[in-house]
Amino acid sequence: MSGHGTSVAAIAAGNGRGSVGGIYAGVAPESELLIVKLGNPRREGFPRTTELMQGVDYVLRKALEYRMPVAINISFGNTYGSHEGTSLLERYLDDMSNYWKSVICVGSGNEGTSAGHTSGMLKEREEQRVELGVQQREPALNVQLWKSYVDEVDISVIGPSGVRVGPISERLGTQRFRIGGTEILLYYGKPSPYQTNQEIYFDFIPTGSYIDSGVWQIVLTPRKVVTGIYQMWLPSQSVLNQGTAFLNPVSSDTLTIPSTASRVVTVGAYDARSFSYADFSGRGALEKNAEMWVQKPDLAAPGVRVTTAKAGGGYGEYSGTSFAVPFV
């Protein structure tokens, strides 16, 4: 998935005939593959999670039709959501994990060192500033802030030039304002049947070709605090310019979705040469119930400089949790 299907499939079941002595054969070279292509990745726009659900449904129905067990490899992830296992996609995968003779394995993502996540604790009458560095020639950017719906927070935004807009209180619909050459859309989300936390969504759109570079600040001004915990995520590092990141990142809670589903096997990456966990590999904790938290990933597999087949022929070295999943 996401443009590396050939390499992932070769790790799982490649015959190794293109290498001397078959040294680069896959983990299970005699196994049969059922390939589902979702489409090409897009730089702009939301991930196609509904297409992923359709793909999983197709594979499970075929496995039942053929009366064969199936291991589903999902080398795909995104950062859009509360990361609590409560979205429609995550719950769907949890349900499908109980269907037929199946196991669903998902990569934990490569956001561990991307500086794309931060978090904190709100306190009444105490303003908090979250600093975000934006590199030059960044064509667009969005930021998610997730908090308890019972906490009430006003938002201000300070641009690289020092211009401040806000505080902006919650209201229905999208609020628009402009700082320099960047238009900002701010949306306060509402609870849903799948999500009781609130998302505050920021969309940075250039009035020209690129949004203003430099240090942006998102200012949180609490009006009422009950739980106080907030989390913030950027898009995956693969769609951002290098260096666009939170200036005070938090490396916990860097799992990508849907590896946050509780019943899937979440696979992290380790370096098979040094036997150390890969620093880029996502990690985090999911709340199983009021008294128990489950740590993810569930296990780790080789995911650093893995030699596997390339699309078009030959072999190459690849790193990432996408390449750890097919080992499982």
Task: Please identify what each model-predicted range represents.
Residues 1-328:
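Loop-rich non-cytosolic ectodomains and luminal regions
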